[in-house]
C-alpha cells in the first residue's frame, strides 16, 4: 500500500493500517479491532436479514475495495474461506465511497462497521460466517533510528490499544 511504501521511503515514521504479507522490513503491532459487516441497499432481497453467511451473497454484484486497499486483501481472504468470489460491479478505495455506491443501488459490500453507515440508505447485516477477526496495526520500519517523540508516541498507542 501507499502507506507501507511511505514508511520504506522514510516519508512517515508510523502508519496505521491492515497487516500486509511479505513485508519483512516492517514491524506490525496490533492496536485495535474492527468489525466488518455486509451492507445492502434499501429494498434489497437480503435487507431483512440480521446475520448472513458470506457464501449467500455470492449471487449478488458487489462493490469492492480497490486492490490498492489493505482491506481488499482481508475481504478476499474471507471470500476464499467461503469457497467463492463475487462478481465485482465496481471497486473504490474509500469506505464511504463504497457505502455510497451501495446506497445508490449499485451492489452490496463488505465494509468496516462505522458510524456513518447509520446515516446512509443502507441496511447493515452482521457477518456470521466465515469467522474472522480484523485487526488494525501500527506499522514502523524495522532497524531504523526513531526519535524520542516517536518512541513516546508508540508507547502511548500500545498503552491505549483497544484489543
Predicted feature residues:
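Short beta-strand-centered segments that line the small-molecule binding cleft or hinge
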Residues: 1-40, 98, 102-106, 121-126
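Secondary-structure junction motif
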Residues: 47, 61-82, 146-154
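Short secondary-structure boundary segments
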Residues: 19-20, 42, 112-115
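A late-sequence structural motif
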Residues: 124-163
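Short beta-strand-to-loop elements that line the ligand-binding cleft
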Residues: 18-19, 85-94
